[in-house]
Amino acid sequence: MSRGRALTLFVSLCTALVTVGLVNAPPAAAANSAYVFAYFTETPNGNGADYGLHLAVSQDGLNWTPLNQNNPVVTPTAGTLGLRDPFILRKQDGTFVILATDLNGTDFGQNNQYLHVWDSTDLRNFTGYRRIRMHNLNTHTWAPTAFWDASRGQYGIVYSANNGTDVFMVNYTSDFRTVSAGQVYFSPGFPVLDGDVVVDGSTFYLYYKNLSNGLLYGARSSTGAPNSYTTYTSGLRQGSGMEAPMLVRNNAGTGWWLWGDSYSPVNNDYYAWSSSNVGGDSWTVMNQRAYTPPLNAKHGSIAGITASEYNGLVSRWGLPNWTRLKSSNFPDRYVRHADYLGRIDPYPFDPYQDQQWRMVPGLADAAGVSFESVNFPGRYLRHSNYEIRLDANDDTATFRADATFYRVAGLTDSAWSSFRSYNFPDRYLRHFDYLLRIDPISTATDRADATFRVTS
């Protein structure tokens, strides 16, 4: 055989082997391009409390859409029959585990050594429900978070407990069924609550609440080992009472968000910060225009998901059949009815259903829209003497015209929406002194007052 022919055969054989290797190689894991939020719900007077597992999805990690009509997708069947503080972890094999506090309601004096646990391949189905005992102390087991510890080849489950003071405990596990004995994970010399552990490369970050001053802080460690963390940030808070920090890296890997659950001056409000450098003390308060938490969401967790998983969740659980309208220039306020008048009020409030609308084809022109109340079906937002009221549809031509609007690009932000009156086409839906009306629009303030985000 000539050297040239031998070389040709050798190259052909190598090419074939490479081709076979490529064909038989396992497919790479799809990149995360969306997010899922796990939470339970409460409202200021308890009207919206539900202690099952709720899910919401988001394309951008900031503006959220509740699934399953904001009803729970699964509820505990043992222990207290309720949960708080659900945490979603994507495991090393790509599947999910869900952990949650075993507490149905707000009796925080209950002692409970257990956590709820579910397995899921896709968050469309939940299997293997169980409770796992974390310790035998006469105390609680609150706010679980979990992470992969590569040096141990195990997962760490961190939670709030009290061993004479409020500390974080940790148990290690390979299967979320059998756990090691609990040990103190973080006890910085002052009481702490609600830890969240995130691993970024070789650095472990632990965000927590300092119960002595009520502020949120970040600590870090190069090993993630128990009692190895050092606090590196200044204290953070929005509102007057905040807990449950959630540290989230965006899917692009270019930045971070920190969420905090505010319970005072009114229960059930989320605030957020952003940073391009989680390792620095450089958190910036985000304008509430930039984010919309899930309706009534409390102390939860956020995980990245793929486009396929996002579509699967929407297909399985469905999108809301209602909308909300968020004010552009008062982004803590939402359109609602009160005493049959239209207005914008700071969220959260009860009845929370006052802000939910079915945006239906316009009563006078199907190319427009009308807003039917969710909790007063048959009543619509309509103008009367240019003021917006919630009135029953009397099926007259006048009512249908008064209750119809054309949705157009937002007058102050084209990514948002404005609503032009059907029968007074020079006037737009806007707020003035927090009351809704239709007015001609001429100034920058007018345009801002007439711009809303259609959200859920």
Predicted feature descriptions by range:
Residues 16-17, 45, 431:
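General secondary-structure propensity
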Residues 1-30:
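Secretory targeting and sorting signals
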Residues 31-321, 404, 414:
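Carbohydrate-active catalytic/glycan-binding domains of CAZyme proteins
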Residues 318-456:
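Lectin-like carbohydrate-binding module/patch detector with strong preference for beta-trefoil
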